[in-house]
Amino acid sequence: MPRILRTARVPGIVIKAGWAAALALSIVLAFASGCGRSGPDPLAPAFRVTVPAERAPFPTPLPSGRKEPGFVLRGTKGWAWTWDQYLAEIPYLARYKMNFLMSCYTSVFTDPVKFVNRWWEPLPQATLAGIGKVAAACRDAGITYCFSFHPALFSDRPLRYDSDEDFDEMWRNYASVQALGVRWFSLSYDDIDVKGRDIAALGAAHAGLANRLFGRLREKDPEAELIFCPVYYWGPADQGEARLYTESLGRALDKDIFVFWTGDGIVTPRITRGAAESFRKAVDHRLVIWDNYPVNDRSGALHLGPVVGRDPDLDEVAYGYMSNPLAPQNEINRIPLLTCADYAYNPRAYDPARSIGQAIRELAETPSRIAALKDLVELYPGNLISGSALTGYNCVLEKVASLVKEPGGRKLARRLISRVEGVAARLDREFPDGYAETKKTLAAHIAAARDMLSAPGPAPSIERRAP
C-alpha cells in the first residue's frame, strides 16, 4: 500500500535493523550484517535453495477428502504496473491456482510515475481500454479482476466526504469501469494523514462513503463486491486510535463489504491467527489479507525468497490472501509469487524450503537456467528471510556497505561484486528475451556497489528508517 520510501542515499537501499527471530520455519538461516555469513567462506550464501530433481504437483495438492483450497480468494495485485504487465501475469495466476488479480490504484493515477492523483478527472480512454483488456483476459482465465481506486493519496484535493459533487466525480470512474463488466472493486484510504482528526468520526465517515459507493455499484449489478482498505489496516486494532477507528468503521460499514488487512504489522515478519482474530473482532467484517511481500515500493530492492512467517490456519479467519508485488520487475516477481500461491492454496502443508525450489523449477526448463535463477535467489533472498521490515532492504548493497567498513573488507566486497556480475551475465545469457527490468536492476546495483568500493574513507552512509 505503497509506503513510498525515497530517502536512500545509495540507490535501492533503505535499511533498518530487523528482527533476530528465526522466521524460516523449515529453513535454517544464519544472520549477520547484511545477508549473513555461512561457514568458512564469509561470502557463502546464508540462504540456500535446493531445487528438486523433478517437478512435483504445484501448488501442493490438498489432502485426501478436502475439496476446497485454503483461502477462497488467492492472488496478487500490481504496483504501478502497466496494463501489459498485468496481462503477462494472468497465465501464471491461472496455472498455479490463483483466482484474483487487483490493479493497484497507482496504475490509474493521473501520472503513475510521478504519483500525481487527480482522481476527480475522468479516466482516460487508454486507461479504460487497458482495464477492459485485463478484465476480459481474467474472465477468460477464470480469474476475478478487481479495480482499485484511492481518492486521497498524493492528491492536492482529497475527496470531501460530505460533498455530493466529489462523490459523483469519483463515482463516474467506478461507473466507467463497471460498464466494462467488472464486478469486484476496492476503495482505499490507506496511508493518509490523520493527525489531529477525530478518529472515530473518520471511521464513520469512511463507512458512509464506502456504503454509498457499494449501494451505487449494486444498483447496477446486485452481485457487485467491494473491498475497503482502512486507515488502520494492520495490527490487532485492540487499543488506542486503531481500535477507535476500526470499531467505528465496522459498526457502520455494510456487512457485505470486505476489509483489507496486512497482518501484525505493515511490512511484517509474522502474520498470526491471534492478530487476525483480534482485528476481525474489532471490524466485524470478512477479511482479505493484503500481504506486503515481496513488495519493494519501486525502490530497486529484490525480495526473491519464499514467503515465510504466515500462520498455517489463517484461512479460518480470513476470506482471501493477496500478495503485494515487486515493481517494475513483474517477471522475476513470479518466483516469490508462486510460493505465495502455494501457501494460499494449501497453507497447512506449506513448506517454504520445498516451495522455493519447486517455484524455480516451474519457471526454468534447463539445468543452466535453473542454476541461474537459484543463484539469483540466494543473492537476494529478501527482507523476510533477512530479518528486515523494510520494502527497500537490499541484501547485496547492504553487504557491500558493511564489508568496506571492515579491515580487509574491500577485497571481499570485490569478490561479492564479481559474483553479482557473474549471476547477471548468466541471467542475460540464459534468458536473452526475459527479465529485462531485473537486468536493469542488477546493473544499477553493480554500479552502486562499485561506487561504494571506490569511495575514499568510510562507506557512504545509508539512511535507515522504518516504513
PLM region descriptions:
Residues 40-48:
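Short, low-complexity, disordered segments immediately C-terminal to signal peptides
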Residues 93, 187, 321:
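Conserved, mostly hydrophobic/aromatic
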Residues 47-173, 179-183, 218:
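Feature activates predominantly on carbohydrate-active enzymes
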Residues 348-467:
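C-terminal functional modules
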